[in-house]
C-alpha cells in the first residue's frame, strides 16, 4: 500500500496537477475537511476507479482542509476533529495518489482576500438560512480547489444534498467543465448516516440521533401506503425527531434538483432533515418512493 504524496503548499499542488493534466492524465478529486470515515473513503475509491477509466492510470487526489470561511462565529471550527496521520493512512488504503493538506489556512485565504462565490438560489433556505455565509465559504473554497487541481471529475456525498446542489449550480454557471458525481449516503449498520461530527455524540445522544434515519424510513413507508401530502409527511418526521429529544432545525420536502419545497411528494422527492442532539447538529436526507 503506497502512501500518497502529501503536499502542503497550494502552489506546489497546482504545479503538480497542471503537469499531470498537460501530460494527458485524467484527474479525479475528492475534497474533504478530514477526520475521514467510510463515507469519504467510498468517494475516494470511486475517484480511483474514475481516474483510471480512460484506459491508463489516472491521478486520484484528495484535499484535507478545515475551511474557516464556512464556519459561523458560534460554530465548531476550533474543536472540529482532526487526525492528519490517520487520514493519510486511510487515503492510502483508498488508493489516492496525492493529498493536499494546506499547512496554514492563510495559504488558502491570505489576509486581504476579498473574492467570494455566491450561488444565489441553491444557497437559500435550509442550511443557508440556519448557517448564514456557510455556502459562500463552501462555494469559494471548492472553486479555488477546482482551479488549483483542474480535475476532470469531482465526487461529493449526497448526505450534504444542498451543498451538492450549490456545487452543481456553480460548475454549470461558471463553466468549470468538471463532471460532478454525487455518491450515496453511507450508514452505520443501525442506520445512522456517517459524519465526522458523530464523534461529538454521547452514547445516549447517538441512540437518540437514530430518529433521523427512523423518520426517513417512516416517511418512505407512509408514501408507499399512499400518503403524498407534504404537510402530513413533514409533521410525521418532525414528531419522530422531537419524540427522541431532537431540537429540530428544519424538516422539508423538496424537488431533488431545484430544492423548491413541494406540496405533494412525488417519486424522487427528497426529505431533508436537520436536528441537534445535545450540542451536535446533524443532517440527513432520503428520496421518497
Swiss-Prot record:
Keyword Magnesium on entry: no
Chemical reaction(s) catalysed: (R)-pantoate + beta-alanine + ATP = (R)-pantothenate + AMP + diphosphate + H(+)
Keyword terms of this UniProt record: ATP-binding, Cytoplasm, Ligase, Nucleotide-binding, Pantothenate biosynthesis
InterPro entries: Pantoate_ligase, Pantoate_ligase_C, Rossmann-like_a/b/a_fold
A matching Pfam family: Pantoate_ligase
GO cellular component: cytosol
Positions that bind (R)-pantoate: 70, 163
Residue positions binding ATP: 33-40, 157-160, 186, 194-197
Pathway: Cofactor biosynthesis; (R)-pantothenate biosynthesis; (R)-pantothenate from (R)-pantoate and beta-alanine: step 1/1
Gene3D superfamilies recorded: HUPs, Pantoate-beta-alanine ligase, C-terminal domain
One GO term (biological process): pantothenate biosynthetic process
Active site as annotated: 40 (proton donor)
Single GO molecular function: pantoate-beta-alanine ligase activity
UniProt-annotated location(s): Cytoplasm
Binding residues annotated for beta-alanine, in chain numbering: 70
More about this protein: The reaction proceeds by a bi uni uni bi ping pong mechanism.
Matching NCBIfam families: panC (TIGR00018)
Family affiliation: Belongs to the pantothenate synthetase family.
Main function: Catalyzes the condensation of pantoate with beta-alanine in an ATP-dependent reaction via a pantoyl-adenylate intermediate.
Assembly: Homodimer.
Entry protein name: Pantothenate synthetase
Gene source species: Anaeromyxobacter dehalogenans (strain 2CP-C)
Gene name as annotated: panC
Amino acid at each position: 500500500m503506497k502512501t500518497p504524496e502529501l503536499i502542503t503548499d497550494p502552489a506546489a499542488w497546482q504545479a503538480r496537477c497542471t503537469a499531470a493534466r498537460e501530460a494527458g492524465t485524467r484527474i479525479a478529486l475528492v475534497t474533504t475537511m478530514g477526520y475521514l470515515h467510510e463515507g469519504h473513503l467510498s468517494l475516494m475509491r470511486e475517484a480511483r476507479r474514475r481516474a483510471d477509466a480512460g484506459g491508463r492510470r489516472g491521478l486520484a487526489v484528495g484535499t484535507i482542509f478545515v475551511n474557516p470561511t464556512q464556519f459561523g462565529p458560534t460554530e465548531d471550527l476550533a474543536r472540529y476533529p482532526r487526525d492528519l496521520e490517520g487520514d493519510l493512512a486511510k487515503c492510502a488504503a483508498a488508493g489516492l495518489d496525492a493529498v493536499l493538506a494546506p499547512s496554514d489556512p492563510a495559504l488558502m485565504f491570505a489576509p486581504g482576500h476579498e473574492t467570494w462565490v455566491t450561488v444565489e438560489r441553491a444557497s437559500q433556505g435550509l442550511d443557508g438560512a440556519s448557517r448564514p455565509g456557510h455556502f459562500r465559504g463552501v462555494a469559494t473554497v471548492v472553486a479555488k480547489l477546482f482551479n488549483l487541481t483542474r480535475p476532470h471529475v469531482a465526487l461529493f456525498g449526497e448526505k450534504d444534498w444542498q451543498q451538492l446542489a450549490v456545487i452543481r449550480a456553480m460548475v454549470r454557471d461558471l463553466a468549470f467543465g468538471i463532471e460532478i458525481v454525487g455518491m450515496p449516503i453511507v450508514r452505520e449498520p443501525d442506520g445512522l448516516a456517517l459524519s465526522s461530527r458523530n464523534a461529538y455524540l454521547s452514547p445516549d445522544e447517538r441512540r437518540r440521533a437514530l430518529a433521523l434515519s427512523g423518520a426517513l424510513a417512516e416517511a418512505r413507508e407512509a408514501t408507499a401506503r399512499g400518503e403524498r401530502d407534504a404537510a402530513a409527511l413533514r409533521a410525521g418526521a418532525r414528531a419522530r425527531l422531537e419524540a427522541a429529544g431532537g431540537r429540530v432545525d428544519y424538516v422539508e420536502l423538496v424537488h431533488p434538483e431545484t430544492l423548491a419545497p413541494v406540496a405533494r411528494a412525488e417519486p424522487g422527492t427528497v426529505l431533508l432533515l436537520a436536528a441537534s442532539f445535545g450540542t451536535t447538529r446533524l443532517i440527513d436526507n432520503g428520496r421518497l418512493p
